[in-house]
Amino acid sequence: MAYSFTEKKRIRKSFAKRATVHQVPFLLATQIESYTQFLQAETPTARRKTEGLQAAFNAIFPISSHNGLARMEFVSYHLSNPPFDVKECQQRGLTFHSALRAKVRLIINDRENPGKVKEVKEQEVYMGEIPLMTSTGSFVINGTERVIVSQLHRSPGVFFEHDKGKTHSSGKLLFSARIIPYRGSWLDFEFDPKDILYFRVDRRRKMPVTILLKSIGLTPEQILAHFFVFDNFTLQAEGAQLEFVPERLRGEVARFDIADKNGRVVVEKDKRINAKHIRDLDSAGTKLISVPEDYLLGRVLAKNIIDPDTGEVIANANDELTETLLENLREAGVKQIQTLYTNDLDQGPYMSQTLRVDETADQTAARIAIYRMMRPGEPPTEEAVEALFQRLFYSEESYDLSRVGRMKVNSRLGRPSGEGAMVLQDEDILETIKILVNLRNGKGEVDDIDHLGNRRVRCVGELAENQFRAGLSRVERAVKERLGQAETENLMPHDLINSKPISSAIREFFGSSQLSQFMDQTNPLSEITHKRRVSALGPGGLTRERAGFEVRDVHPTHYGRVCPIETPEGPNIGLINSLALYARLNEYGFLETPYRKVVDSKLTDQVDYLSAIEEGKYVVAQANATVDADGNLTDELVSAREGSERETRMVTPDRVQYIDVAPSQIVSAAASLVPFLEHDDANRALMGANMQRQAVPCLRPDKPLVGTGIERTVAVDSGTAVQAMRGGVVDYVDAMRIVIRVNDDEAVAGEVGVDIYNLIKYTRSNQNTNINQRPMVKVGDHVARGDVIADGASTDLGELALGQNMLVAFMPWNGYNFEDSILISERVVAEDRYTSIHIEELSVVARDTKLGPEEITRDISNLAEAQLARLDESGITYIGAEVEAGDVLVGKVTPKGETQLTPEEKLLRAIFGEKASDVKDTSLRVPSGMSGIVIDVQVFTREGVTRDKRAQSIIDDELKRYRLDLNDQLRIVEGDAFQRLERLLIDKTVNGGPKKLAKGAKITKEYLADIDRYHWFDIRPADEELAAQLEAVKEAIEQKRHEFDLAFEEKRKKLTQGDELPPGVIKMVKVYLAVKRRLQPGDKMAGRHGNKGVVSKITPIEDMPYMADGTPADIVLNPLGVPSRMNVGQILETHLGWAARGLGERIGNMLKAQAKAAEVRKLLTQIYNESGKVEDLDSLSDSEVLELAENLKKGVPFATPVFDGAHEDEIRRMLDLAYPEEIAKEKGLTASKQQVTLFDGRTGEAFERPVTLGVMHMLKLHHLVDDKMHARSTGPYSLVTQQPLGGKAQFGGQRFGEMEVWALEAYGASYVLQEMLTVKSDDVNGRTKVYENIVKGEHSIDAGMPESFNVLVKEIRSLGIDIDLDRY
């Protein structure tokens, strides 16, 4: 196997037992593909599919006027290039968008001859702005990065369920069905406790279902024929003869003696008819059975009975037979009657009873009844009734099942999946009711609504399309009204179309929808997880309050589709999920997961993606099944999942049809980063997966020594690490950019063969963490497409590195690690292991006020020169200035209203011309509790306002940087061109040239080197073809230079034009501060196994427990945190990390002793290739082996994949390899090498028992004490209660609540209590007085009436109760 440029620098030793057959798919594919399909920007118009924007346009257009004379047709659309790139949008606070323009055709027909076209106008119309997705799957909206989270909602289709006996006190199951369209009215069918079947539309008033059946044109006879089988009777003078159907009699009690055709009694009266009786009757050839009169009474007629002579209706279908009715029938000479066959077990009389409740006579009456239910109080005219009925379920404009809905309806009703319209059909309604009645009769199963075959994912593209369609339909209404005027007023299409509704719908969705979220950008993992999130909340989804336990629970169909571990703790648990590692969406929006095909117990290389519906048909084995070298399943019984319930059973290998592609396929990206996940309790694994997302990127990232092998995928797919777009040679590198000369075979003709990567330097993320990229390549390095060439935040050599590898000891230490506290060595802080940089953005705006414009200036009165020292002449702080709380960053003055002056002040002003007091100082200062270094300043100026010097210098720097990029590209393009020219010209004959080159002479290399390269074009070759080539190269270079000049001009224009600022703002200045945060007591830390704690003390190195060779521990954790939490994975990680560190030390010692490459290779082979995955070390050269060894000095990184990780014996083997006997003795290790004798740093004495010691990857979480620490002496008060505000953001006070008052009451501290409730809180006069007293040096208080008491009195008065206070 070939290693990439970065992989071979540090190979991760993997313990995986199973080879990967299927690579982890690109982790952001769902987001990016969905939005690409929505826009179809790159697809030529003719080849666009009917989805996304195209589908929305096709659905709304053509639009016809009310009189039908004018219509507007849609031709095509295109998206223009975005005016600003992503970075510029972030800086300026703009949306990264593209203008959507649609070409529409207005066709006007002749008024006299409507069939004839009078005129056609075609025009391109602006249709609003569509936000574009960045390359990493996010959106920049108003300058901030946002993510549109996918939504998991109930799929359109038909669903059958029951109420689980909760509705009625008897516990009877009430069955119901619901037809849910993608757009349109919901149709519900439900049984009531009396077994009458009702329907309701959009949860309105319920009505008997037969009304709906009559409204679609069925008569009562037809309704009964659809739902019942009939008994045929032939009437006789006394009683009747029943046509014998054997099955129908079984289980009934005979109400009379039943005889066969010979008159022999087979069943006596009052005996239950069993299978033997049926057989006897059958074998005797009984066709008819004589039944007495009372057997007929109470039965229900199946058809209308008409008098053969008169033609009048004697009895209606669904009438009960009575003695009178039977007499009438006999009199009319009716011989044959049909009745409904019903019984109590599996053929209930439900539809017959429902027909009795229904009072409507025919189709018209039924439709009027539905109209009255939908529009109560409106008079039902025939047209209105018809229009409403059609619009409910049969109109494509208002009702849409969608392809998914039609597929689901067809599969549930047992029809071929492709056929049927997108609106509801009569058969759909009838079939649904039939299945529902069958369910009530005990046949069939209800649906499981939590099954992933019944829930589908709506991605960004689909959500955006729905919004766009909503906006477009608003436009349609307006256009329809104005189309009538198009002919008379000679209007063009752009006069008719107003794009505002579209823009506002899109803006509202991206800006304030519940699914459009502020991107979590703490580290690369949190970014990628946010984009892979699936939420059941949001518009059209569930609400937190209504969601029960079942929806939140893990369902068997989640396997390989949705992660069972990663979900938030708290009210959203189970409603917000993460996609599993290999999951993807199919064309219908259902989640699919890959399985490897198994044929005759042998694994094949075919991988199929199955949705939850398809998977139910197959037997699927788990990835941990034993497989021999040829890929055969060797166990006698294999654990597999089968059936619709997906229950795990033991099956024989020949029955297995599929097998999982990888053990990690059931978990998400975050959970698959937890090593030894299989040894952790599920609750702690959940915390571990969630807390990795909160890890703050450290100043010096450190790859985890014990990983899972997925770290590189996450780092690369998140877009944090920079990948080479094309292979080539590194031409130039500095901290800001990398220039790569592209390989000839990858360069496209006529295009610059140069890739320039501008690295992100010290940029603020959404969570104020620092995003900074560092190059990893040197000039001359050969890189291939996809190689990592620069590390980003929290990445180390292209691998995700969220924390630091720490030497951890599990032991109590003087109570400092009680209750999950963490004891840290001073060395960790001194080495800046957990130091992180946070970037704060502070901004100030200068507005145009009523009294005059605010001004950003250095000239501020009443400020000492020392406070202005950091400001330049424009009044803006220098880059690099160290600032603390209260320092001025940007000087600003605001005009204030004229105040009344005393005569003395007037005199002074007249003498000295003092004008400064007309303005007040409103400068931007560093907020309290913050200090740092200014790293960047940006100045935005409104169009038409002259720029200050600082703003101009910022623009000049930006242009200089841009020019540098262009020069680099030009240099490489010219270099390539001249190299090609040199090859062409050497040894060619000429007709003349510069430096008196004689005719017929041959060009030499020396001659070309002697003259200026640009003079080569003056050479006149004898060969005309060569002369043409020379001219072509010259033109190509000039063309490129011209293009670059144009690009530079464009950039300059963009920078020098005025900035778009909010109304009333003249100038805006943004100052970026870099704040360095060291680890300190109160900071929250965690491992990857849900083992979290707070730093309690930072102890001097000399006091930390140390080993026999003097190595002190970095962190001391409490061993009691492990057993009750059951996250044993952390112990296994500690042991394996200890082995990794030991192996690194061994390699380091070999390099120190200058061992030969062959010796190093031997040790590496022992480490890498004696268990687990075999690495191809022979493919590396000696220098590469030594570079690899150099990178392994701090520890050999291990990969222990989830559910396929290192076993105990493998960990032991690694420990034995890392610590041979002499080293183990020197370090004081026990025989198992998993524990060590430690010594107390303060006394030097050995601890009583050996201590578990090893290396664990620990994270610093984004809950820093600096952000929470807060103190206040005086500050703002609430207006009404006059009590201090609360919270750090408001600079609030500490709440002295009810319980604290009880405490003081209990102690009898009455004076303390009095001042707490009065002068320290809301006694306005009292607190002013106290301040005066303190100033005077008197320490006494005079407590008055608290303001909140006055508020209480006012509230009581508002109830009409007057309270007067009498003072005694």
From Swiss-Prot:
Transferase is among the record's keywords: yes
InterPro entries with a match to the protein in the record: DNA-dir_RNA_pol_bsu_ext_1_sf (IPR042107), DNA-dir_RNA_pol_bsu_external_1 (IPR019462), DNA-dir_RNA_pol_su2 (IPR015712), DNA-dir_RNAP_su2_dom (IPR007120), DNA-dir_RNAP_su2_hyb_sf (IPR037033), RNA_pol_bsu_bac (IPR010243), RNA_pol_bsu_CS (IPR007121), RNA_pol_bsu_protrusion (IPR007644)
Keyword list, A-Z: DNA-directed RNA polymerase, Nucleotidyltransferase, Transcription, Transferase
CDD domains the record matches: RNA_pol_B_RPB2 (cd00653)
A single GO molecular function term of this UniProt record: DNA-directed RNA polymerase activity
GO-annotated biological processes: DNA-templated transcription
PROSITE patterns found in the cross-reference section: RNA_POL_BETA
Record-linked HAMAP family: RNApol_bact_RpoB
Function: DNA-dependent RNA polymerase catalyzes the transcription of DNA into RNA using the four ribonucleoside triphosphates as substrates.
Assigned protein family: Belongs to the RNA polymerase beta chain family.
Designated name of the protein: DNA-directed RNA polymerase subunit beta
Species assigned in the record: Cupriavidus necator (strain ATCC 17699 / DSM 428 / KCTC 22496 / NCIMB 10442 / H16 / Stanier 337) (Ralstonia eutropha)
